[in-house]
């Protein structure tokens, strides 16, 4: 469950290490984002020669949350931390690699590229 001011690790090779959620997209009163939701983020920590730099604003999709995701069969998939993948204005991933597992909930038409790049889909 991600809200404004939440910090997330970055699960791709754009050069960003940590981002902060500045807005949950999808309605003016929307407060929380879960796996598969799009948020607006600010880069808080970045590698020196990365594709993005500190202070840049991007869209991102949440790929892992510590709160977890409830499946229709009753199972709950939780992770150790919160992670996101940076997106461009067309909502395509900026990076060319994804690190760590992602959930099956991302298997929509919009995020099939992320699922195919991920090393493990839970």
From Swiss-Prot:
Coiled coil: none annotated. The keyword Nucleus does not apply. SMART domains: Ribosomal_L14. GO terms for molecular function: large ribosomal subunit rRNA binding; structural constituent of ribosome. Pfam families: Ribosomal_L14. InterPro entries: Ribosomal_uL14, Ribosomal_uL14_bac-type, Ribosomal_uL14_CS, Ribosomal_uL14_sf. GO terms for cellular component: cytosolic large ribosomal subunit. Keywords: Ribonucleoprotein, Ribosomal protein, RNA-binding, rRNA-binding. Part of the 50S ribosomal subunit. Forms a cluster with proteins L3 and L19. In the 70S ribosome, L14 and L19 interact and together make contacts with the 16S rRNA in bridges B5 and B8. Belongs to the universal ribosomal protein uL14 family. HAMAP family: Ribosomal_uL14. NCBIfam families: rplN_bact. Binds to 23S rRNA. Forms part of two intersubunit bridges in the 70S ribosome. PANTHER family: 50S/60S RIBOSOMAL PROTEIN L14/L23 (PTHR11761), LARGE RIBOSOMAL SUBUNIT PROTEIN UL14M (PTHR11761:SF3). This is Large ribosomal subunit protein uL14. It comes from Ralstonia nicotianae (strain ATCC BAA-1114 / GMI1000).
């Amino acid at each position: 469950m991600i809200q404004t001011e939440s910090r997330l690790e970055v699960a791709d090779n754009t050069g960003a290490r940590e981002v902060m959620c500045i807005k949950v997209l999808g309605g003016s009163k929307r407060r929380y984002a879960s796996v598969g939701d799009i948020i607006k983020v600010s880069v808080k920590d970045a590698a020196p020669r990365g594709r993005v730099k500190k202070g840049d604003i991007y869209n991102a999709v949440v790929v892992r949350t510590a709160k977890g995701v409830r499946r229709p069969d009753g199972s709950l998939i939780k992770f150790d931390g919160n992670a996101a993948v940076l997106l461009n204005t067309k909502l395509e991933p900026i990076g060319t690699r994804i690190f760590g597992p992602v959930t099956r909930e991302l298997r929509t038409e919009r995020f099939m590229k992320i699922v195919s790049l991920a090393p493990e889909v839970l």
